Amino acid sequence: PSSISIYGENIAINNVGISQGNKYVRANGIVSSNESDSLTIELNELPVDYIQDVVNFHSVEFGGRASGRAYVTGINNSTPTLDAYIKVRNMIFEEGRMGNANLHAFWDSEVEGISSKGVMIDEGDIYTGVDGYVSPKNNRIDLLVSTHNTRAEFLNGIIGSIFDDIDGHVNGDL
């Protein structure tokens, strides 16, 4: 069974979640200002576009199904930390198929956003590296994208107003 217990300024969360079929988000841990207390959030097959809606971030569009874990500490203090290991099945970036993503993300107080590093592996020798950050609060994104035979479809979402039906493969850093 699930439970939420409140002790002064601390909140203990035990197996609290929402699910539908194989999709779920689940939380366990303690919410407090103590940095040794943490909250673990588990995701399974959660739609990435839904996550974008929740944080109200649409500077660029992502899609796919996210699964993994995020660890949050010091939620009630001025410098909380977030450390997440996420896999995204059938990742979409700006209308382009990117394959399956393995990402490490963490809260970066310097940019007031989430810094991430990872790789998206498509079929054959197609893969794309990513390193940078997104800041929903400041509506900013700064990503170094390293392409290796990456499908060029994602450029439709970026420069599609200038060029139509971009297809092919891309190599190099963007």
List each model region and its residues.
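Interface amphipathic segments
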Residues: P1-D173
